[in-house]
Structures are given as structure tokens and as C-alpha cells.
């Protein structure tokens, strides 16, 4: 089997419009200058777009993944991949990983291509990807997460999650350390000792605040403290990890870079790794195995590719991971999002868990007529 074509398809949904992007805004009430993000309410509404990569073979098997790849990046992949066998997945990974510097691209740039190869290999074998890798669990528990809010807002979100059977919640908060402590205490008191709580202050703490808050989180039995400071400060994360017993998780803004992410774990600057299959399934699995040998976890960021399908597979294949990160308001939120582009079977949250389909490859089922009707560019 040989690769014959690599296509970058840009789809546009004329029935859905958005402003997209973020603006930078200052956090009020802090002595230091601290920023966060918000939307762009004055920006013109535009039709929503999404790109997909397709890898075609001479046996008629096609791998598909959503992507943020540029036409130039797709052309690099096309130049090197056409004529190669998709069974050379590891060799192609090594070539693009080691060659990243020489084509002047950011780390992880070819992740969608890697995902397409896994899709092809599963379809050729007649097996779901979870069977190719080796399944360790039939389904993965989810935690619900959302935006910055107040005590009532967090408790309301937790109740929404409970209605879906979800037993864990992750805060996002940009208020600064001292403002967060009474919120964490109040929510823990409200939900009781057995509900799982996690927090992600999104770089809104300094080191002193992170240590102070971290000790409170230990008292309140939180699962982990995520990205409390800007991740470029490795020495501060090393000090934080030494000071706390709660798991500290950095590397969300570094997770596209397999080498930097590995070094953070090796150098004791994080207790858990962050990963996202947007940067490739092979990369995620390599990081998971590295973490496993260090007695650490990898936690997957958001849905990955194909509206949760890819992370549903990987979460059921990786022993050292705890949760699927879910942002939805209803149990079928992922399915609704996928349906916009013709994906019919994005996973549901059922009894607080997510599970992959049993079809070959990623098991994605498509309304091909709808998918094709939305294509506005092909590269």
C-alpha cells in the first residue's frame, strides 16, 4: 500500500458565524500587572471555518483528521510522503520530527498527518486504533471544566456535570492566589470530600502564591494544580514541585514540543505531563510511555482531534492517565460540534465516561455529502 495524495481541505459553514480569537485584558485588583483573555465583541462576524487533512492510498483507504496545518506545511508532507507506505508510520514520524528544524516549522506541526496514518492502519487491519495500541480500559472518566466565574457559577457547573454522571470538576480562574483560596474552600465544603476537584489558574499566580495556594489544595485534597505560573520559568516550577506534595502539572503551552515536555519531567519541573493528539498520536504515546517509566501521569488536553474521538481511543489505551477533559454543556456537545462538519458519531458522555467507537481506524462515521458540500478550498 502506497500513499498517493495528501489533501488539505478548508471547510466553511455559512450557517454558523463567529468572531474567533481572543483579546488581551488586564486583571484588576492585583498589585502586579497581570493579563488574561476575553473575546472580541467588536469584531465582525464571519462564517466559521475548519480544515481537514486527508491522506489517500492506492488501495482506496483514506485517513482523515481535522487540522490547523497550513498549505505550506501540507506541501512539505506531500513532498516526502507520496510514494511511501503508511506502514512506515514510525519512519515518517522520525523523519518529520528530526527534520522539523530543517523545514523551519514549530514542533508538532505534522500531527494531523500522523493521525491520518493511524486511521489508515486501523482501516487496513479492520481494527479500531485502541486495538492496535492495546486497550487498558473500556471507557475513561471525564471531568467537566469551564471558564472563570464565582462560587455560585462553579457550583452550578458542577451540578450540570453531576446530571451527566461526571464526578470531577476543574476550575479555571484568573483572579490571583489570595482571591481563589476562599472559593476553593467554599466549593469543597459544598461538594463534600468524595468529589474530585482540580484547578487551573492559567498562569495567574507568582511562585509565592502558587506555594501558598498549593498547600491549601493539599489540605482540601485536590487532584492536581495546573499551570499556575508562566511555563517559561522552569526554575520556579522546579521549586514549586519540591515544595508541594500535590501534583503540579505544567507544559500545556509546551506540549506541542515533545523534547521540551520530556525535559520538564526529567528535570523535576512538572509532576504530570500535558499532551494533545493535535500534535500526533505517536507523540502522545511516546510521552505517555516516558511518563509511565518515571511513575508519572500524562493528562490529555481537551478533545484532541475529531471532536473527542482520538482522545477517547488514547485515553482507553494509556494506563497512566486519569481523565478526559470535557468542556461541554450537555452530554452530546461533542456530537453536535462534529455534526457541523458531517461527523456523525463524535463520542457522548455516558454515566460520566467517554468511550471510543469500535469501527476500524478512528471509527469516524461521516455524512460525506455534507462534508464535501462545505469545502471552499483545497490545497
Predicted regions and their residues:
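Conserved, mostly hydrophobic/aromatic
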Residues: 3, 60, 113, 126, ...
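Metal-dependent enolase-superfamily TIM-barrel catalytic cores that perform enediolate-based chemistry
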Residues: 131-239, 243-244
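Hydrophobic faces of well-ordered beta-strands that scaffold small-molecule active sites
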Residues: 65, 142-146, 169-171, 197-201, ...
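Metal- or metallocofactor-binding catalytic centers and their adjacent structured scaffolds
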Residues: 56-124
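Extended hydrophobic packing segments that form well-structured cores
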Residues: 360-379
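Structured beta-strand/loop patches that form or line metal/cofactor-binding pockets in enzymes
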Residues: 1-59, 334-335, 340
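Shared catalytic-loop signature of beta/alpha-barrel
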Residues: 32, 90, 215, 221, ...
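Ligand-binding pocket scaffold of soluble enzyme catalytic domains
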Residues: 58-64, 124-127, 132, 290, ...
